[in-house]
């Protein structure tokens, strides 16, 4: 068979009726510890996985990279260097959807460096390669004996269109989707879901997840088939033997203190120092331990006791660290119009999480240009999320926007998108910026609430206000507590982070990560969604108390944007020879004018009067001469021996014959008018060639 194909194996999986996916191993990147090539249509993604040496970290050092190279779509990148630069937002978001479900597959305590790299090899105009890379990453770590994971995993995209669910849809199918989600799951349980929707009810989300999980099971069956063909035996991870005596000693030192602290109903500003004090006291009590490795192990046992203590208090007493019951949300307060020159602004405080959110209205020239595998597109709505270190009282490097910030911003952005007005009715470019000033969990959800208020404060006519809530879960056997509006501690020590955004009518955005090995039972998922709906209602009420509907007028500091439609055969008249006419209007009015091939004209100006002047000038330019109509401000453009040519409408000239200048005989045209004069004229005729005859004397009393 040759060098390229002697180790190649490939399977084809029908993931839905008439829709297939292939997974190939053994041909490309054979020196990687694991690799898989996944294909749908002509879209192909290759993902590799490599294992390094154990790292001296307190966390699992997994890194995920994903690149959409322009050559995969038969394109050359733009820019001076003509090569791919830093990862795009789409590439960063895809890294996150690969990372989040794969990371929990590895056992606790595993510290070897692992690097997963996804590369798009071919991109057609039908299928998005992101979910192929997700499945490829999961297949790469499973179809290798190096990685000690116990279950294979796969991912799909699901949309809802006209009541039908479609798995791994085409781009065209996705354009009319009411709901879209990307999910990852093992054969038994769902581990990650994220997506957006146009105010769909909760049951539609559950149905979409069930459809997706069924398709994932088919993919996993194919991956297992490949495993059998390759004869791969999975590595077993041998966890370090627990030092029971040391663990018992640590537990005796801190358990009761942790239990008492978590029952103390403390805010974060009290809770965190109290927990740190317990740790400091424990270190002092363990000062006889000289070996730093053993001391580090003891601190690990301490963290386990802390986790168990918080969970026990919630499950046994029904009390959360800040004193709330599981279903209770934190108090929310809102203010709008807090920044004098911002077009719209809001403060949203939820417990100890505070977001300052601004909304800025721009023009068409402010749209973001995106160069992707599908070509160049423009984006007229953006939401940017910033999480400075001072928001949690830390000192860290401030610089490049991190993946977490990009991910949180994307969730908030897509959650607000369904309620925005269509560009035809509101032709502004919108930018929302959320600055997190304080944080104790759910900062991305504060960005959604604050973003909704900032848009309304800016006068953006949104369909409905949107609120977001983060749900958590504590599960130990049959004991389960669903937590509304979780804090940072509950997120870190709990079993679920389920962010749900929506209006009173339905869901607009969501993101779920599950840490449970057996997944989330359907009845618990339903309860969590219902509890989230009730929590959203609390926040919507607080938001409505601050501002119940969009302001009737946009900010005086926002640019004026006016639009009108002109006949397509008049576009050339607006532009003029070499752009002369449109440039003249812009220079005279101070506005900026854009016209597309369909005759849609957009006029933008910093000063409203400038925009209105340009609007009138364009309207006048589109006017046709009417016999019998008087034009009071015609401008003399040129003078001949037989008359004067005047511009009576923008870009339209006519002749005032010398005999039509005065009621008396005129010897010289210059005796009556001069270049640049403005005179009143009346249209007295239009010949067969469209030439306009004008009269000044017809306007004289």
Residue ranges and their predicted role:
Residues 2-51, 56, 238-375, 559-573, ...:
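Extended amphipathic alpha-helical scaffolds
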Residues 2-238:
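Long, basic N-terminal domains or extensions that often function
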Residues 32-115, 120-127, 194, 338, ...:
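Glycine-rich, flexible beta-strand/loop modules in the N-terminal catalytic cores of phosphate-handling
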Residues 34-37, 44, 127-147, 336-359, ...:
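Conserved phosphate/anionic-ligand binding catalytic regions in large, soluble enzymes, centered on
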Residues 108-114, 148-150, 219-237, 269, ...:
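Flexible, glycine/charged-enriched surface loops at secondary-structure junctions
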Residues 146-263, 455-552:
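Mobile "lid/hinge" segments at catalytic clefts and subdomain interfaces of large enzymes
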Residues 233, 237-244, 538-564, 612-633:
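Long, charged amphipathic helices and adjacent flexible linkers at domain junctions
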Residues 559, 568-701:
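Single-stranded RNA-binding regions, centering on S1/OB-family and related RNA-binding modules
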């Amino acid at each position: 068979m040759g060098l390229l194909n002697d180790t190649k194996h490939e399977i084809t999986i029908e993931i839905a009726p008439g829709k297939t996916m292939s997974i190939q191993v053994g041909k490309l990147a054979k020196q990687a510890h694991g690799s898989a090539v996944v294909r749908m249509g002509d879209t192909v993604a290759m993902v590799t996985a490599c294992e390094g040496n154990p790292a001296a970290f307190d966390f699992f050092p997994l890194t995920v990279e994903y690149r959409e190279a322009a050559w995969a779509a038969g394109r050359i990148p733009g820019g001076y260097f003509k090569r791919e630069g830093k990862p795009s937002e789409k590439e960063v978001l895809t890294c996150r959807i690969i990372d989040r479900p794969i990371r929990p597959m590895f056992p606790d305590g595993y510290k070897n460096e692992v690097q997963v790299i996804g590369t798009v090899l071919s991109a057609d105009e039908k299928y998005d390669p992101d979910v192929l890379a997700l499945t490829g990453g999961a297949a790469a770590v499973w179809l290798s004996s190096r990685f000690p994971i116990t279950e294979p995993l796969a991912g799909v995209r699901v949309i809802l269109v006209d009541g039908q669910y479609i798995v791994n849809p085409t781009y065209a199918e996705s354009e009319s989707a009411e709901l879209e989600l990307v999910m990852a799951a093992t054969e038994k349980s769902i581990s990650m879901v994220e997506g957006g929707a146009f105010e769909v009810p909760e049951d539609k989300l559950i149905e979409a997840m069930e459809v997706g999980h069924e398709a994932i099971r088919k993919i996993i069956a194919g991956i297992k088939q490949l495993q059998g063909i390759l004869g791969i035996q999975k590595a077993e991870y041998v966890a370090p033997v627990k030092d029971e005596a040391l663990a018992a000693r640590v537990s005796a030192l801190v358990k009761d203190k942790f239990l008492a602290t978590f029952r103390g109903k403390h805010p974060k500003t009290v809770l965190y120092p109290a927990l740190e004090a317990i740790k400091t006291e424990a270190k002092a009590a363990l000062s006889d331990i000289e070996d730093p490795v053993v001391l580090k192990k003891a601190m690990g046992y301490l963290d386990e006791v802390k986790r168990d203590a918080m969970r026990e208090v919630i499950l046994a007493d029904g009390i959360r660290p800040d004193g709330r019951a599981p279903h209770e949300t934190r108090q929310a307060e809102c203010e709008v119009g807090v920044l004098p020159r911002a077009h719209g602004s809001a403060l949203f405080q939820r417990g100890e999480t505070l977001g300052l959110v601004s909304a800025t209205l721009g023009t068409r020239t402010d749209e973001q240009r995106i160069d992707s595998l599908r070509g160049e597109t423009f984006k007229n709505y953006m939401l940017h999320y910033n999480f400075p270190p001072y928001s949690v009282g830390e000192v860290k490097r401030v610089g490049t926007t991190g993946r977490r910030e990009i991910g949180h911003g994307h969730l908030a952005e897509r959650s607000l998108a369904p309620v925005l007005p269509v560009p035809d009715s509101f032709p502004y470019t919108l930018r929302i910026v959320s600055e997190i000033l304080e944080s104790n969990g759910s900062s991305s959800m504060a960005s959604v609430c604050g973003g909704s208020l900032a848009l309304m404060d800016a006068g953006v006519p949104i369909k409905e206000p949107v609120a977001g809530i983060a749900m958590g879960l504590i599960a130990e056997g049959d004991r389960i507590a669903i937590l509304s509006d979780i804090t940072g501690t509950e997120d870190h020590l709990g079993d679920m982070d389920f962010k749900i955004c929506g209006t009173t009518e339905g869901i607009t955005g969501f993101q779920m990560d599950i840490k449970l090995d057996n997944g989330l039972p359907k009845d618990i998922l339903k309860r969590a969604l219902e509890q989230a709906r009730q929590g959203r209602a609390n926040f919507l009420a607080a938001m409505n108390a601050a501002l119940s509907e969009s302001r009737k007028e946009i900010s005086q500091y926002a640019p004026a944007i006016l639009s009108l439609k002109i006949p397509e055969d008049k576009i050339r008249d607006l532009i003029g020879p070499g752009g002369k006419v449109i440039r003249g209007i812009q220079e005279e009015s101070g506005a900026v004018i854009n016209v597309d091939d369909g005759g849609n004209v957009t006029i933008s100006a910093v000063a409203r009067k400038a925009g209105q002047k340009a609007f009138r000038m364009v309207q006048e330019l589109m006017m046709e001469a009417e016999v019998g109509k008087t034009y009071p401000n015609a401008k003399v453009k040129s003078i001949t021996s037989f008359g004067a040519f005047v511009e009576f409408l923008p870009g339209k000239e006519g002749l005032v014959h010398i005999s039509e200048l005065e009621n008396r005989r005129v010897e010289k045209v210059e005796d009556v008018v001069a270049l640049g004069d403005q005179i009143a004229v009346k249209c007295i005729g239009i010949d067969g060639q469209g030439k306009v005859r004008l009269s000044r004397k017809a306007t004289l009393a």
